[in-house]
A protein has these predicted regions:
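A short hydrophobic/aromatic micro-motif that marks alpha-helical segments and, especially, helix-coil
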Residues: 60, 66-68, 104-108, 146-147, ...
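Long extracytoplasmic/lumenal interhelical loops at the membrane interface
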Residues: 21-90
Length: 165
């Protein structure tokens, strides 16, 4: 299985088809299909500002014309992208608040420490969450946000390794 994994091929597998971004990689294409369905449907249904809320599974995951979105056990309700999930649940305003919160954390760090080294911890966590359900679960968000709190609270005591001298 590991011999078949070709990351470079997947990265260059994206193309436009009938106005939609698609991929020759089945997993990437499956996720792109869900994400685009969520965003397009929100614009079509006028939910850009309010989102779907938190009381139900996204309609796109229940779409009978796209079997398999709920997974083999029928329990998969996540869209596998934290930004799309935030946008779909609470609309553009909630997505703005998410970005403003993280920008505030970064600016606080910058003002206290005069560098952007906190990005070494924030960016990888967010990138992973763009492609999987890490921040849509229970454990990872607790670890992530408690770590950020601890790191920011003790920023003057924490010695961050200087990477560039």
């Amino acid at each position: 299985l590991a011999d078949e994994k070709d990351t470079v091929r997947v990265i260059f597998s994206f193309y436009m088809h009938y106005g939609r971004l698609e991929s020759t990689d089945p997993t990437a294409n499956w996720r792109l299909d869900i994400w685009q369905d969520v965003v397009f449907d929100m614009f079509e249904d006028g939910l850009v500002f309010s989102g779907y809320g938190y009381n139900e599974i996204f309609p796109q995951m229940l779409d009978p014309t796209a079997p398999g979105r709920l997974g083999r056990d029928g329990m998969n309700e996540h869209v596998h992208n934290y930004f799309v999930n935030i946008f779909a649940r609470g609309g553009i305003f909630q997505l703005f608040l998410f970005f403003a919160f993280h920008l505030g954390l970064i600016m606080y760090w910058k003002n206290e420490n005069h560098n952007y080294q906190i990005l070494m911890y924030i960016i990888p966590s967010i990138v992973v969450s763009l492609l999987d359900i890490t921040l849509e679960g229970v454990q990872f968000p607790l670890i992530y946000y408690f770590f950020l709190y601890y790191f920011l609270k003790n920023s003057t005591k924490v010695k961050v390794i200087e990477l560039y001298g």
